[in-house]
């Protein structure tokens, strides 16, 4: 069965970037560029007129910036939006805010046709553009509405909770290993923010995200939870009460190593080949922890396209760990958890808002 052609609109104030993205997307037989726009205001007019299947939207533009444009799209003309973002703290922060507004995913701004990474970047841009069209916009809107309903009292409680964190310990009773892709940033904010400060577990996360963005995402998540959240670095010791997020463009695996005369489990980062088009890979993390932690593991496979995580989940299950797959009812894209369910690997299939409670029951 032939796939329907996906109609894409590019909104970016740089003529060079519009041309590069047009050339990249045009190489995919399932994608067709129906128009380009040079700023947010121009983009809104073309969205109303052309009704694209997906919009690629620059986050920083004159006249009408990316966030204002995104807010209008979400409210007036719901369409999957993939943000185009450069590196830099301001650009990364705007992009993370865009996820709260309703963006589906983010792509790295292509730097030029001579870039050595252009083939990989082009493949990722096309893949994320295709995946965005499968997003459940109703679930995105429901998550957005819940976030906007949060009161100032709730926010103050989160800050106080954050200040009263418990001490971390390298004695690990349980490991929560989480994999997510499209729709993952908002899902992770909700899930990790629901964990109690004294949860008896170390938390390891692979979120498919470009290099550079995971550092900003880690800082943002750290400010919204009672747990310590950081982007993983080579040699980080696995500790209860700490959340390690795999850095973009690096696989994160857990290995055993002697540290100051004591055997510890630590993070090992590598740039070995991508798996299923992704680096970091959920499978790589799950495979590495299975023989080390065995029945101490609870692996969660959240929203995302394709099937990363299923092979690794099989290894975890063989070693006695538990598997939780996100239910279709709360997924932005029901791909990764769907494969886990299809292969009958899931011990639990739960909507996002029921996961934290079940996890606490399992590990207590």
Swiss-Prot record:
What does the entry's free-text domain comment contain? Contains a C-terminal catalytic domain, and an N-terminal region which modulates catalytic activity.
Report the residue ranges that make up the Response regulatory domain in this protein: 7-124
Q: Tell me if Cytoplasm is a UniProt keyword of this record.
A: yes
Name of the protein described by the UniProt record = Protein-glutamate methylesterase/protein-glutamine glutaminase
Write out the PTM section of this UniProt entry.
Answer: Phosphorylated by CheA. Phosphorylation of the N-terminal regulatory domain activates the methylesterase activity.
- Protein keywords: Chemotaxis, Cytoplasm, Hydrolase, Phosphoprotein
Q: Which GO terms describe its cellular component?
A: cytoplasm
Localization in the cell: Cytoplasm
Q: Which residues cross the membrane?
A: none
Supply the HAMAP family for this chain: CheB_chemtxs
Which CDD domains did the record assign? CheB_Rec, REC_CheB-like
- Source organism of the structure: Methanosarcina barkeri (strain Fusaro / DSM 804)
- Catalyzes what? [protein]-L-glutamate 5-O-methyl ester + H2O = L-glutamyl-[protein] + methanol + H(+); L-glutaminyl-[protein] + H2O = L-glutamyl-[protein] + NH4(+)
UniProt entry tagged with the keyword rRNA processing = no
């Amino acid at each position: 069965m032939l796939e329907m052609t996906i109609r894409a609109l590019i909104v970016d104030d740089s003529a060079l970037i519009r041309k590069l993205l047009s050339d990249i997307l045009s190489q995919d037989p399932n994608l067709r560029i129906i128009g380009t726009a040079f700023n947010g205001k121009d983009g809104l007019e073309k969205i109303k007129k052309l009704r694209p299947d997906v919009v690629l939207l620059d986050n920083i533009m004159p006249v009408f910036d990316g966030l204002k444009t995104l807010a209008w799209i979400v409210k007036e003309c719901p369409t999957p939006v993939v943000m185009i973002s450069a590196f830099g703290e301001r650009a990364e922060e705007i992009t993370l805010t865009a996820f709260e507004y309703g963006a589906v995913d983010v792509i790295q701004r292509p730097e030029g046709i001579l870039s050595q990474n252009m083939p990989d970047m082009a493949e990722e841009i096309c893949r994320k553009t295709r995946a965005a069209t499968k997003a459940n916009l109703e679930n995105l809107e429901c998550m957005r509405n819940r976030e906007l309903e949060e009161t100032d009292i709730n926010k103050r409680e989160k800050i106080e909770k954050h200040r009263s964190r418990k001490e971390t310990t390298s004695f690990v009773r349980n490991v929560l290993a989480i994999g997510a892709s499209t729709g993952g940033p908002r899902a992770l904010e909700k899930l990790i923010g629901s964990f109690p400060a004294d949860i008896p577990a170390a938390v390891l996360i692979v979120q498919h995200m470009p290099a550079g963005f995971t550092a900003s995402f880690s800082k943002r998540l750290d400010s919204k939870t009672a747990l310590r959240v950081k982007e993983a670095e080579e040699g980080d010791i696995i500790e209860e009460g700490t959340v390690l997020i795999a850095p973009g463009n690096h696989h994160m695996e857990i290995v055993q190593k002697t540290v100051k005369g004591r055997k510890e489990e630590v993070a090992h980062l590598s740039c070995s080949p991508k798996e299923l088009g992704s680096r970091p890979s959920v499978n790589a993390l799950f495979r590495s922890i299975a023989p080390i932690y065995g029945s101490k593991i609870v692996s969660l496979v959240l929203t995302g396209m394709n099937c990363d995580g299923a092979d690794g989940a099989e290894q975890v299950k063989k070693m006695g760990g538990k598997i939780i797959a996100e239910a279709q009812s709360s997924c932005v894209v029901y791909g990764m958890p769907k494969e886990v369910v299809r292969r009958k690997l899931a011990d639990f299939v739960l909507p996002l808002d029921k996961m934290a409670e079940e996890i606490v029951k399992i590990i207590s």
